[in-house]
Amino acid sequence: MTSASELFSTRRSRPGRSDPALESDTSSYRHHSHHHHRRHGVHHHNQRHDSDGCDPLRRPTPRLRRFFHHPIQERSRPIRDVQGTSQYLNTDSTDTETQSSSFVNLNGSERLPGAVLLARDRLFERLRGVSLSSNSRSNRVSLDDQRESSFHSIDGDPIFQLAGLQVTYECNKKPQGLTQDAINCLHRQTFSSAEVKSEMRDCSICLESFTKGDMLISLPCTHSFHSSCLNPWLRACGDCPCCRRAIAKE
């Protein structure tokens, strides 16, 4: 025990000198460690060489490396425009701009002054009135055209032509008016309730009832009228006002 303690104290008292056994152990450890790192480095280099040379699909692109080395760009996304160039835009800023633009588009009309809104409403009303008036005018023109075409078709119908000719003939065929002498030759009588039938007690010209003492004119068709009412009619037309029977001239 004494020799061991002396040896230990002796080694501690000489810091500048090293133990050959310890140096050999340290050198062997360093050599083993250097050899291990070298082999590991060669193996890692071979793996990189194999990954870069043999499998091109596993080779990371420079863009991905740039993303890996710069984490601040992970929030950016590439946007390819029409010409094919790549542009990196920030996602947060793009979303914010989109929301702001949509907000402006939605609230653009609400931000207009009141006078502008009123003017726009008046313009819309005028345009609507112009469109309605043009539509009504076109409809009116189409109705007029239809009426004219219907009238032309009626005029061209032979049946209506014959009817018109018949009416014209009847009008032209009416008897001429009577002279005053012919009127004076008609049968006259004084009204008496006992002599006249009940259904013939009204004048069909003035629509008044006969009274006792009225002077009446009785035509050949047995219709009786006030003489004052029938005289103008007979001077204009020589037929009965009720049945349109011609009065024979004597």
UniProtKB/Swiss-Prot annotation:
UniProt biased composition (Polar residues): 1-10
Lineage, top ranks: Eukaryota, Viridiplantae, Streptophyta, Embryophyta, Tracheophyta
Protein name: Probable E3 ubiquitin-protein ligase RHY1A
Entry keyword set: Metal-binding, Transferase, Ubl conjugation pathway, Zinc, Zinc-finger
GO MF: transferase activity; zinc ion binding
Region (Disordered): 1-106
Protein's GO biological process: protein ubiquitination
Compositionally biased intervals (Basic residues): 29-47, 60-69
Keyword field contains Signal: no
